[in-house]
UniProtKB/Swiss-Prot annotation:
It is found in: Virion membrane. Keywords: Fusion of virus membrane with host membrane, Fusion of virus membrane with host outer membrane, Membrane, Transmembrane, Transmembrane helix, Viral envelope protein, Viral penetration into host cytoplasm, Virion, Virus entry into host cell. Mediates the fusion with the host outer membrane during virus entry into the host cell. The keyword Ribonucleoprotein does not apply. GO terms for cellular component: membrane; viral envelope; virion membrane. The keyword Transmembrane helix applies. It comes from the Viruses. Its main location: virion. Interacts with P3. It comes from Pseudomonas phage phi6 (Bacteriophage phi-6). GO terms for biological process: fusion of virus membrane with host outer membrane; symbiont entry into host cell. This is Fusion protein P6.
Amino acid sequence: MSIFSSLFKVIKKVISKVVATLKKIFKKIWPLLLIVAIIYFAPYLAGFFTSAGFTGIGGIFSSIATTITPTLTSFLSTAWSGVGSLASTAWSGFQSLGMGTQLAVVSGAAALIAPEETAQLVTEIGTTVGDIAGTIIGGVAKALPGWIWIAAGGLAVWALWPSSDSKE
């Protein structure tokens, strides 16, 4: 399986889980949303029912429109601006992070939502990087003579060996 296939599986799984969660939430709060919609559109419903000849129902919606709708509209406006401000702050904070940190945050979120698909993606990336590194190292190892490798190894040991002139 390729990296792109694994990546699309992760994205598909994350989106499907988010949509499923939103469906569950929507099913739970459906009555509340219906009541809010009726109150929010009460001025229009009052005019509609009055013009249709249902003056009693139009009067009920008219009283809702004058008492509850302004409060609800103010609350929804305040809530919407607060959510917009929060989302804007979160997005600008995320954008200010480095590319590696952004990748770590997104990978962590994906691992929480879709652990199996994320593990498969990480395995694919590790395998691909290992194959590429093996190909490059194998090509370089065949191109250089052996004495250069021995000299480079000796130089690395000399550079990494702790010195005996420690000043304590």
